[in-house]
Amino acid sequence: MPRCERALPSRSIATMPAVFATGFLVGFLEWACLLVVKPHLDWPAEQTVGTHVDVSHEAATPPGLVVTARAKLVGVDGRKLRFEVEADDGIDLIARGTHERVVILRERFDAKVAEKAAAGSDPGRGGA
């Protein structure tokens, strides 16, 4: 399987159309979900992380338009939160879908990430 070893976009990204990119749109929708639940969490000890995204990017948005993201919490199953999301640019509905997040204890989460990072930097481990 090919590996992506670039941390920054290549020059080929510069040839992409000048529109609001899908990856940035998904991040913006995630942020809207966070704003919905943050007041109900013991922040910063409790936080949420995204676990699933099912979003259709339906229309291009050129520079200069204002994008508005909306998120509605539609389901809670233990620590799992399910949202309906959408975004518009004042002209078109540009995205709609669902997003799932899980409530985490930040300290515990950070400890697991640090453990994984240490294991990944072990030269005897091999890596992916």
Predicted regions and their residues:
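Hydrophobic beta-strand-centered segment that forms part of the acyl-chain substrate-binding groove
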Residues: 33-68
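Conserved N-terminal beta-strand and adjoining loop/helix that marks the start
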Residues: 22-26
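Flexible, active-site-adjacent loop/turn segments at secondary-structure boundaries
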Residues: 6, 17-18, 39, 59, ...
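Generic structural detector for well-ordered beta-strands
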Residues: 1-3, 56, 98-102
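HotDog/MaoC-like acyl-thioester-processing domains
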Residues: 62-63, 72-128
